[in-house]
Structure formats: C-alpha cells, structure tokens
Amino acid sequence: MPRAIVFDAYGTLFDVHSVLARCEAFWPGKGAQLSQLWRAKQLEYSWQRSLMGRYAPFSQVTEDALLFSCEFLALKIDGKEKQALMDEYRRLALYPDVSAAMKKFKGVKRAILTNGSPDMIDPLVAQSGLAFDAVLSVDELKIYKPAPQVYQLAVDRLATPKEQIGFVSSNCWDALGAKSFGFTVYWINRTGAPVDRTGFQPDRIVKSLDEVLL
C-alpha cells in the first residue's frame, strides 16, 4: 500500500471545462469550442516553454492561451471579459466524485502536484474544502510537468520514496510522465481514450476517482 497519494489538480480534481458556461454567455454558440482550444493551448504553451527554457507562471500561460484562442476563433475580448474568465479558473468546480472519494484516503499522506501557480491553485484548494498535507507547484522549479524533476519534488517534500507514492491524474501525458519517473500510477480515463504511445502504461486505468483503490 502506498504511504502517500499525490493528485494532479486540473482535469483530475477540478473540472477545467466548468469555464464553459461563462464562455458561452460571452459568445453564444462558441463556448465549447473556446473552452477546448483554451485548454489545448494552455498545455501546449506550458510544454513549449519548458522545452525552450522560458518559464512563465501558469497564470500567464493561461491568459496567453485564452487570448490566442479568442483571436483564432475571431472572438473579440475586452479587459473585463478576460478578467472574468481568468477569475473562473480560480473557482473551477470539483468533479462530482471527488469529495466523497477523498474520504477513502485517510491514513496516508495526501498532496497535490500541479502545474498551477500559487495564485491560481491556492484559491481552488481553499474553496474546495479538501485537506492536503502539501500543495506542490511547479512554480518552485520553473519547469512544467511531465519533467521528471517535478515528480521528484513530491518525493522530497513528502519524504517518501517514489516506490511508495501513488499518483493520480486524468491527463494521460501526466500519468505516463509519473510512471516513467517511477510512481505507481492511476489514470482516471473519463472519456474512454486509448493510452498514449510513449512506451509506458499506467498501473491501473479507472473511470473515476472513487475507483482508485490503494
């Protein structure tokens, strides 16, 4: 049994597409398209910045991705709309299965390991009502997941060998990055997607957090 369980935040505990309603309110008929592209560019920019060695906080990456997405989709966005959407990212909804499922993980260290910068992740955790032993941000290292040194941060801060850490993510690229590093990995595959072909496999594939059994 793992001595610690580490969770990704965005897309795993918090639904990144809970911004869709506000997107749709601003641009009727375009909300879903904007939400999807915004998330895709957010990830792309984080990886690109890591490869270039040009770190910027996740809040900046998220804003840049939003502005690109609006430009690409020919959606005019003003300062108030931009701020409203950025504020939405600081109050994303928990997935419905999260609160009850977290009660199962008593007796082990619990942590979040996230690409989110403190100005984005701290408000989310505070409003969630969830308790963690640590909330770890890549902002300390200035590089994004799936860089191995990010997963090492969890080992160091939790003072737990990687072989005794369970890692939970709904993002396959993150799950496989954690597996490559040496964690026991639970991939929450909510959409029934195939495993990415990178030479690694999650230890267990589940459909929701409440299926994760240590």
Identify the function of each model-found stretch.
Residues M1-I5, S99, K103, L113, ...:
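Asp-based, Mg2+/Mn2+-dependent phosphohydrolase catalytic module
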Residues A32, A40, S46-Q83:
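A metal-dependent, Asp-based hydrolase signature
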Residues A21-R22, L37, D64-F68, A84, ...:
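Alpha-helical elements of Rossmann-like donor-binding domains used by nucleotide-donor carbohydrate transfer enzymes
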Residues M1-L43:
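Active-site neighborhood of HAD-like aspartate-dependent phosphohydrolases
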Residues K41, G107-V108, A131:
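Structured helix-beta-strand junction loops
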Residues Y55, S59-Q60, I77-I112, G116-P118, ...:
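Short, acidic loop-to-helix structural element flanking the phosphoryl-transfer center
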Residues W27-G31, F72-I77, S128-A131, A159-T160:
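Short helix-capping segments at alpha-helix termini
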